[in-house]
Amino acid sequence: MKDLKTVEQSTLKTFKTHRPSEYFKEKENDKSFNVHDKKVEHLYRFGLAFPPEYFRGRTLIDLGAGTGHHTVSLARWGAKCTLVEMNDDALDVARNVFSEFSEVEDHHFINSSLYDIDKVKYREKFDIAHSRGVLTHVADKRGAFEILASLAKPGGYVIYGDRNTCGGIQEMLQRLAVYSYAGNDELQIVNVSEKLFSDDIERSVLSVPRSREAVIYDRWVIRQQDDPSISDVIDFFEENNLLYVNSWPRIDFLGRGVSTFTDPNNNHALKQGAFLVENLWMILNDGESENIKSLEGVGIGEYKNLLVTVANMLRNL
């Protein structure tokens, strides 16, 4: 296993250069906040089936809260939030965001690694333990999830979200191409990523508004990238004696009317169904092939061949 602190310092260095969790301008009258706030509400209400009403009057801790641009929506729904973030610059932004869009004095801000928080002081103290888009960048996901789970009260909720391993495989193949062509030169990594995956970056910007460079730093410049599968996540929940409920994405089977993703008592069926969906989704790689063909350089041909090999293997399953 990679050294926890070495990985953390590398990640911190990257995210001090570009903060990937900045989605709107810090002005109440700027429509970018309202756009983002509505997207967050849609995600929780319809995607996660955990509507804003569930946050009202509850205590919540957010591990890896970043700039607070996401957490502030949960606060506006009535949660009393504790934000844990190792990037002091991002935490300063979070304080400003909460001052602008919430009642900052009702919330707490802790500048710390998630591994270094006072686990005795905060154990089972929160109605909701929350972390999204964080564990994919740590060296020990299982240990980090155990910490997250320990913070929730008995009968409380753990909300965990991250990239999926099938998307991670795509990104690892993309990283093979980028690093083969650009080496470790940060500027070259940015330029090659833009050249190779312009369409992909554009989709990311449209989906979650932020700068193109922020997307590139979050996906290709960052050194630590290790995404869990749905099966991994189910194991995390079971190992910590948590009831696993997932409502997004949905798999609706003909004649049943109910997605297995909403059945917390059928994790085996969920793992099987999720494996199929992950593999089908992973081979949908149209959009970048012409850009790949147009580049000549070390590693680009290998990247294309590897994509084809993976796709053929999955089609033969």
Regions found by a protein language model. Give the residues of each.
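Conserved class I S-adenosyl-L-methionine
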Residues: 157-198
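Conserved alpha-helix/loop element of class I SAM-dependent methyltransferases that forms part
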Residues: 34-57
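A short glycine-rich, Lys/Arg-flanked "PGG" loop and its adjoining helix->strand segment in the class I
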Residues: 142-154
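A conserved beta-strand element that flanks and buttresses the S-adenosyl-L-methionine
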Residues: 130
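Conserved SAM-binding loop
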Residues: 94-95
